[in-house]
Amino acid sequence: NFDEPFMSYAVSSGGHSVIERLFVDKPNEMTSVYYLSAGQLYMDHYCSLGNQPRMVAAPTTLDEIPFKVLSVTNMASKNDLHISSHSIEFDGPDEITVRWGATKDQEPTGGSFYTVKRDATP
């Protein structure tokens, strides 16, 4: 049930990062932080599974920012379930689709996507 806000974005760190919260205020809440380093866009994902994938933006288009995994910390084994791909698609001025791909036992295991519209309500 996504009738209530389940995804939020906020600019932080003096305008140097964007914080994304997924499943806001739920037990499975996750946080991602987007930031630039030397002109390159990175994303650190703090997963409800307890691991932390670090990703870098791959070549982008006007409509999409794909990310590829650089590393994943806090996994007991490289076979653990973790997020292994991510993209943000810009569907319009007030709508995005966020896609997540997962890997378990070093094989793709599906994923999820969410299309959300901006709510200007403070």
Question: What is the predicted function of each stretch?
Answer:
Residues N1-P122:
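Hydrophobic small-molecule pocket/channel-lining residues, especially in calycin-type beta-barrels
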